[in-house]
Amino acid sequence: MMLQNIKNRLDVVAVLLVIISVGLIQSSTVLGGDQSLFVVIAQLLDSGKTLYKDLFDYKQPGIFLFYLLAGKTFGWSDIGIHLFELGYWILFSLILFSCIRNYSLFRADYFNSLLPLFIIGAYYGNATIFHLTQLEALINFPLFLIVWLLDRAYKTESGLFVTYLVIGVLIGIVLLSKLVFSPIIFFFLLIHFIFTLKSKDIKYIFVKQIIPLCIGFVIPLSVFLSYIFIHQIENLIVDIYFKIPTSVIALEDQVDPDRLLSSLKWFIKKMLVLLLLAVLGVFLITKKESHFFSLIIAWGVIGFLVILMQKTSWWSYHFQLLYVPIGVFAAVGLDFVLYHFLQKVKPSTPLIKSFLIVTIVSLVFFNQMNTLWKGANSQNNTRKYSFDYARDDAAKIIQVIKKEDSIFICGNPRMYVLSSHLPELSTNGWILEYYLDYQWDEFYNEFKNKPPTYLFVKNDYDKLIESKHVKLWELMMKEYSEFDSVENGKWYKRI
C-alpha cells in the first residue's frame, strides 16, 4: 500500500513537472491583440477607471478581472501574465489529481495522474500567441468544478447546502465571464435534475438544490450589480449584454465560413489522435459513472454548438472550450488501448512496462511535442513565440512620445502597453469592424472633442473608417499629418 502511494505521488510529480516545463516554455510568448486589450482594460480598472464606460468592449467582466489579478500578482509584463496563468493551471491540475481518483474511470490507476496531460498539456502544446490566456481555455476550470460538484451532490447528501451554494457561485462566475456559455450550464442542470428525479421528488429538488443554488448565484451577481449601480452604467450594460449582441450577429459581412473551416482544420490537425481516442472513450462509459459522463458529453456537444452560435467570430481559440470533454474521453480511450496492448505483449519487467507506457503516451502527444520543439528550437524563434510586431510598429513612437501626449490605436492595443500610455477615448480601436452605426457617430464626436496627439491606423482600417464614417476619416486627414509608415499601418501626428 505504501509502495503504491509513493508510485502515485511520483506520477503526480512527473505530470506536474511536465506541465510546469511546457508552461515556462510558453511564458515567453508575447501577448496577442486580444490579450493586450485585456491588460489595457485591467490597467484602466487598476487606475480607478470604470469598466465599459472608459473603454468599451463586448465581453463580460470575468476575463478582465482575471487579468487584473494577474497584473497585481506578477506584474503587467507578458511573462507575468503567463506565470499567473501557469499557477492557475497548476491549481487545476491539483484539483484533477484530488477528485478524479474518486471515480471509476480507468483500468490503470496511473491514468488518474495522467489526466491533466490530456487537458492542460494538450492546451499548452497546441497554443500559439492567439490561444494563450484566452477565456475559452480558462473557463475549463470552473466548468469542471461545476461538473464535479454536481456529481458529488448526486452521489452523497452530506453538505448539500454548501455544495449547491458553491455551484451557484461558480455558475455566476461562468456567466459573468461569457453569457453565451449559458446553454452549457442549462444542460448541466437539466441532466442533473433528471437524474435526481429518479430517486427524489420535485420538492426535494426545489428545497435542497434550487434554493441554495440560487443563493450562490446571487452572490457574484449582486457584486456586479452593485458595481453597475454605483458607477451608473445600467444603460451601457443593457446595450452591451442584450441589444448590441443581437445587432452584431446580424452583421453578415462579419460571417466568414472560411474562418470556421480554418479553425476546424487547425483544431482537428492538432487534436486528431486525441479526438480518435475520445470517440473510442465515449463507447466505454460505465453505468456506475453515467451521471458524470452525461455531464461531460453535454459539455462537448453543447459546447460545440455554442461555438457554432458565435457566427461573427469562429476563431480557432473558441475550440479550447472543449479541452476537458475531449481530454477525459481520450484518457479513457487510451487507457483501454494500453490495457489490452499490455495484456497481449506481457512485458517481462516493470521497467519495460513503464518504457512502453511512456513511449505510447509520447506518440499520442506527438503533435503537441513537435509544435513545442519547433517553436523552442527554430532558428527564427522570434517569429515563432516571441515576435512582437507591435513593438516594431511602435518603435519610433516609443522614442518620441512625451508623458503629456495621448495616443489612439486603430489596431493592436499592445501599443498602448508598450508606450505606457493608456487610451483616453472610450472607443475600442481593436474591434472597429464590429461597431454599429450609432457607435461610429459616438466615435466621431469623441474623437472631435478630445483628439489624441498621435493616431495609429492599421492596414485596411483606413478603408473601413472611410466607408463607415466619411466625416470621421475627413477629420482625421484634416487634423493629422503622416508621422511614420510601418509594416502594419501608419502613424499620424496632430497638426
Residue ranges and their predicted role:
Residues 101-102, 138, 144-166, 200, ...:
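Membrane-interface transmembrane helices that cradle and orient dolichyl/undecaprenyl
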Residues 197-200, 207-288, 311:
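Transmembrane-lumen/periplasm boundary regions of multi-pass, lipid-linked membrane glycan transferases
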Residues 183, 305, 312-345:
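Hydrophobic/aromatic-rich transmembrane helices and adjacent perimembrane loops
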Residues 84-88, 118, 125-150, 161, ...:
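Multi-pass, polyprenyl lipid-linked donor-dependent membrane glycosyltransferases
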Residues 83-106, 120, 145:
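Transmembrane-helix motifs of polytopic, lipid-linked glycan transferases
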Residues 162-179, 185-190, 219, 302-309:
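Membrane-interface alpha helices of multi-pass inner-membrane proteins
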Residues 186, 190, 373-377, 383-436, ...:
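Short periplasmic/luminal acceptor-recognition loop of GT-C membrane glycosyltransferases, typified by
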Residues 94, 269-304, 330:
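Hydrophobic, aromatic-rich transmembrane alpha-helices
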